[in-house]
Curated annotation (Swiss-Prot):
GO terms for molecular function: magnesium ion binding; phosphoglucosamine mutase activity; phosphomannomutase activity. The lineage of its organism: Bacteria, Pseudomonadati, Pseudomonadota, Gammaproteobacteria, Cellvibrionales. HAMAP family: GlmM_B. Mg(2+) binds at residues 104, 241, 243, 245. This is Phosphoglucosamine mutase. Belongs to the phosphohexose mutase family. Its cofactor is Mg(2+). One of its GO terms (cellular component) is cytosol. The active site is at residue 104.
């Protein structure tokens, strides 16, 4: 399907540029409302709107609200909430849809939206296509206007849901946890979840001002978390991104534990203590060491395209309940419908509790293969498969690794970059090849 507005993860861009304007968001809200009204007997029902902590979120919230109301749809306003919380609340309120205003791990100058259907799952391609078709039509106000209201205790509902995914009596008592909330949507929720389960919580990056979301903090900037874990002699550090659908850990030695390692810990726990793990979906970027570690436990593994939409699709096709990405998007489909940083973190802590080991000890069960990724900024699209210079460079890199590694080049679905990933047995060679390939890609797109 050729998309005009929607990317692999909704619509995203710099505020004030392209379609990231209040005018477009009002038109988009109206289009969403019209499509829902056509597909639901009750005329569109209720749509929930939540957001992260970007200052532009207020503007876009009001614009979407106006468009939806003009289409005759009622609106429930959740305020700042993690993306997975909005998916959960959409499902439990039996709302027609849920809308998230966020640009995830991007800086505050960016914003965008994600949409969930009534099951709390990202919209199907045909629904997005219908919305794109509608959004370009003249906006006509419905005969019956919708109404808007604030949703009471949305935060409390989600906190109780998170705690309820653990066995009765589960406790984090005696554990010191540093939680980095990226000055984003988890700033109020995450510390409460862990403290209410008994952990001693040291919360950092929990003072959003509208502009400091993801600024030198959160799951993409772990330096502060590593420092705080070591200085406070904490047992563990947990970092979320701006909208709370990604998570990364830091162990008691201050070492990063990424999404592949966290997925393996969860899968191994399910295999040993949870009645088995039917299979795990990773992505093209998943570390080969992750695949080998799962193979040793006889857990099936499949690679999907990058993007939680494709991970979930592969999970559904296989009937598996666990999948995710190296970046920390982890989907535990036995308890939720989308990537959820807090839920994934709780599953890791459950595994640590069962094994009675530290995170550093537990992660040793999976040996990562050296992997280097370089992001190459691009100003124009490049067909990688048809570019002779790029393909020659890839073939030469693979030949130099003598079949003991992987090369992957792919355009990002959320940023104007091409990601160059090289994986092999020797870090020095892997790093050299990755940067050489990045130079070739840079020349090809200049």
């Amino acid at each position: 399907m050729t998309r005009k507005y929607f990317g692999t993860d909704g619509i995203r861009g710099q505020v004030g540029q392209g379609v990231i304007t209040p005018q477009f968001f009002m038109q988009l809200g109206w289009a969403v409302g019209k499509v829902l009204a056509e597909r639901h007997a009750d005329g569109g029902g209720l749509v929930l709107i939540g957001k992260d902590t970007r200052i532009s979120g207020y503007m876009f919230e009001s614009a979407l609200e106006a468009g939806l109301i003009a289409a005759g749809v009622d609106v429930g306003l959740l305020g700042p909430m993690p993306t997975p919380a909005i998916a959960y609340l959409t499902r439990t309120f039996q709302a027609s849809a849920g809308i998230v205003i966020s640009a995830s791990h991007n800086p505050f100058r960016d914003n965008g939206i994600k949409l969930f259907n009534t099951q709390g799952v990202k919209l199907a391609d045909d629904v997005e296509a219908a919305i794109e078709h509608q959004v370009d039509r003249p906006m006509v106000t419905a005969e019956r206007l919708g109404k808007a209201r604030r949703v009471p205790d949305a935060e409390g509902r989600y906190i109780e849901f998170c705690k309820g995914t653990l066995p009765w009596g589960f406790s984090l008592a005696g554990l010191t946890v540093v939680v980095d909330c990226a000055n984003g949507a988890t700033y109020n929720v995450a510390p409460k979840v862990f403290s209410e389960l008994g952990a001693e919580v040291i919360a950092i990056s929990t003072h959003p001002d509208g502009e400091n979301i993801n600024l030198n903090c959160g799951s993409t900037k772990l330096n502060n978390l590593q420092k705080q874990v070591l200085e406070s002699h904490a047992d563990i550090g947990i970092a979320f991104d701006g909208d709370g659908d990604r998570v990364q850990f830091v162990d008691e030695r201050g070492e990063v534990v990424d999404g592949d390692q966290l997925l393996f810990i969860i899968a191994a726990h399910k295999q040993r203590h949870g009645g088995g793990c039917s299979g795990v979906v990773g992505t093209q970027m998943s570390n080969f060491g992750f695949e080998l570690a799962l193979e040793a436990l006889k857990i099936p593994f499949e690679r999907a395209k990058v993007g939680d939409r494709y991970v979930i699709e592969a999970m559904n096709n296989n009937g598996w309940k666990l999948g995710g990405e190296s970046s920390g998007h982890i989907v535990c489909a036995d308890v939720t419908t989308t990537g959820d940083g807090i839920i994934a973190a709780l599953q890791v802590l459950r595994a640590l509790n069962a094994e009675a080991q530290t995170l550093y000890e537990l992660k040793q069960r999976m040996q990562k293969m050296p992997q280097v990724m370089v992001n190459v900024p691009v100003k124009r699209k490049l067909n990688l498969e048809e570019n002779d210079m790029v393909q020659t460079a890839i073939a030469e890199a693979e030949q130099r690794m003598e079949g003991q590694g992987r090369v992957l080049l792919r355009p990002s679905g959320t940023e104007p970059v091409i990601r160059v990933m090289v994986e092999g047995q020797q870090h020095g060679m892997v790093s050299q090849l990755a940067h050489e390939l990045a130079e070739v890609v840079g020349r090809a797109t200049s």
